[in-house]
UniProtKB/Swiss-Prot annotation:
Superkingdom of the organism of origin: Eukaryota
Role description: First cyclic scorpion trypsin inhibitor (Kd~0.5 nM). Does not inhibit chymotrypsin.
MF terms (GO), sorted A to Z: serine-type endopeptidase inhibitor activity
Tissues in which the UniProt entry reports expression: Expressed by the venom gland.
Protein's cellular compartments: Secreted
Name of the protein this chain belongs to: Cyclotide trypsin inhibitor TopI1
Cystine bridges: C28-C45, C34-C50, C38-C52
Covalent cross-link site, Cyclopeptide (Ile-Lys): I24-K55
Segment forming the signal sequence: 1-23
Record carries keyword Disulfide bond: yes
Site positions per UniProt: Binds trypsin: K55
Keywords: Amidation, Disulfide bond, Knottin, Protease inhibitor, Secreted, Serine protease inhibitor, Signal
Temperature dependence: Is very stable at high temperature.
Source species of the chain: Tityus obscurus (Amazonian scorpion)
Amino acid sequence: MKFIIVLLLLTALTLTSIPVIEGILKRCKTYDDCKDVCKARKGKCEFGICKCMIKSGK
């Protein structure tokens, strides 16, 4: 039973992090390149790679 719960948690985490991974993998030169990738999330261009920050509920 524990195994199934762990599996469900891992699946949920994987599904929620896909857009973030996509954003991290996107190559960029400027912040504007990251805007369309990160959309609602704040993004920054670091070492030529987009990094998206997930907005907290606050």
